[in-house]
């Protein structure tokens, strides 16, 4: 079996999706996927540099003492720290991209004021449930919860419209909700390395025939 290295810092999830489909449908090789979720590059590059905040790999345990322009920050990268809470993020009303991968988070503050937030990346944290505050985000399109001990997808998320990209790889999820009709805009769904039965995988494919799904 041939293994492909799929994750790079510069790869976008849309690039990954097309690459995954190429391998899955036009090659006899097997694609092993994990953590290949990223923001769309063209949209990311459109964010002015002074609206981007990079605090990746800074050893942060909290955000006390960090100064943010709440009306200006579009993009916030807090990947690979040791954060256990991010309460200060709740006031960043202009935020569209939020990266919190590889921290120590088990909960989020209320994010209901972040009406512009479109993409949130939460992989490799300690979430046992999908944070319910995501229900209150009307612009949300992308959610990455891969590598968390999440065991089920709540009904409110199954009914949430407007979603385009979801990743639940390397979680404890074994089945999806029965009704997935609200995910009609979904473009890609990562369900890699889950303990799903063949029947459940077949049901998901049938329910979402136009979605790029990676099991």
Predicted features along the sequence, with ranges:
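Leucine-rich solenoid repeat scaffolds
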Residues: 174-215
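LRR N-terminal entry segment and analogous cap-like coil->beta motifs
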Residues: 47-104
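Leucine-rich repeat
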Residues: 69-72, 89-95, 111-117, 135-140, ...
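C-terminal motif of bacterial Sec signal peptides marking the signal peptidase cleavage site
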Residues: 33-35
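Conserved hydrophobic beta-strand positions in leucine-rich repeat
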Residues: 53, 74-78, 98-100, 120-122, ...
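Bacterial signal peptide processing site
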Residues: 37-39
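The feature encodes a structural signal of leucine-rich repeats
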Residues: 63-66, 85-89, 107-111, 130-133, ...
């Amino acid at each position: 079996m041939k293994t492909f290295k799929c994750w790079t810092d510069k790869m976008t999830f849309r690039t990954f999706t097309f690459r995954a489909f190429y391998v899955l449908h036009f090659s006899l090789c097997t694609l092993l996927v994990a953590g290949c979720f990223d923001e769309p590059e063209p949209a990311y590059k459109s964010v002015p540099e002074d609206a981007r905040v990079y605090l990746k790999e800074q050893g942060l345990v909290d955000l006390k003492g960090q100064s943010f322009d709440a009306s200006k920050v579009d993009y916030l990268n807090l990947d690979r720290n040791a954060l256990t809470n991010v309460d200060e993020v709740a006031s960043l009303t202009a935020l569209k991209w939020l990266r919190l991968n590889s921290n120590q988070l088990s909960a989020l503050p209320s994010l209901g004021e972040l009406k512009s937030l479109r993409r949130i990346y939460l992989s490799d944290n300690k979430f046992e449930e999908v944070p319910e505050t995501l229900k209150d985000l009307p612009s949300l399109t992308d959610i990455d919860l891969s590598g968390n001990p999440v065991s089920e997808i709540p009904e409110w998320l199954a009914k949430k419209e407007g979603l385009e990209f979801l990743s639940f790889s390397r979680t404890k999820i074994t089945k999806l909700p029965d009704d997935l009709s609200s995910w009609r805009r979904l473009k890609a769904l990562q369900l890699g390395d889950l303990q799903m039965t063949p029947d459940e995988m077949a049901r998901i494919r049938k329910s979402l025939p136009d979605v790029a799904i990676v099991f």
